[in-house]
From Swiss-Prot:
GO biological process: cellular response to oxidative stress; protein modification process
Active site as annotated: C54
Species for this entry: Xanthomonas campestris pv. campestris (strain 8004)
This protein's UniProt keywords: Oxidoreductase
Protein name, per record: Peptide methionine sulfoxide reductase MsrA
Top enzyme category: oxidoreductase
Gene Ontology CC terms, in alphabetical order: cytoplasm
InterPro entries: Met_Sox_Rdtase_MsrA_dom, Met_Sox_Rdtase_MsrA_sf, MsrA_MetSO_reductase
GO molecular function: L-methionine-(S)-S-oxide reductase activity; peptide-methionine (S)-S-oxide reductase activity
Keyword field contains Oxidoreductase: yes
Function according to Swiss-Prot or TrEMBL: Has an important function as a repair enzyme for proteins that have been inactivated by oxidation. Catalyzes the reversible oxidation-reduction of methionine sulfoxide in proteins to methionine.
The enzyme's E.C. designation: 1.8.4.11
UniProt keyword Cytoplasm present: no
Catalytic activity: L-methionyl-[protein] + [thioredoxin]-disulfide + H2O = L-methionyl-(S)-S-oxide-[protein] + [thioredoxin]-dithiol; [thioredoxin]-disulfide + L-methionine + H2O = L-methionine (S)-S-oxide + [thioredoxin]-dithiol
Amino acid sequence: MLGIGAFKQRMPRSGEALPGRTQALPLHNTHLINGHPLRGEFTGLAQVQFGLGCFWGAERKFWNVPGVYTTAVGYAGGKTPNATYSEVCSGQTGHTEAVLVVYDAQAVSFEQLLRTFWESHDPTQGMQQGSDVGTQYRSAIYCSTQAQYDAAIASRDAYQQQLTAAGYGDITTEILYPAPTFYYAEDDHQQYLAKHPNGYCGLGGTGVSCPIGLDA
């Protein structure tokens, strides 16, 4: 049997992923900061999923952006339905830690969100982010529209030029459309750094400015 460490740098193959469960994990459907629901139809609003390392600090980055209606943390991009945190940490789900960002496109542009995303982590590190190592920490943008996907690809290419000039390697961010299923994480992980102000935050950007979203 493969040990947990075997899945730190590669995705589980068919038959290796944990089976998960059919029932969603319990969720207190109220955002601790703004009181908006975490799960719903969100009519008239846009959605995107971002993965940029540990989702505790990543979520805080986005709930502080004006125009963002709500945020939630969860697991996406893998094979295991309704996975738990411990299962995701095993590497045997294939999920990355993701932040669901629901926003008013009239109040904040997708390009502005992309700029926050790129500048808040190092997207060249593959299956890790800083000292956090594993497939769950990979960089990802999961898009809900073709327009988002096109903008994400364009932003990646523009940011790659800046990173290359600064001596960084190739961007490894996974960009997908349509977005995979977003499985909400356990309650304690939602708005974690608001509940635990001194909690761990491993986010660290490259210091390289992203050239998009400046005038949006």
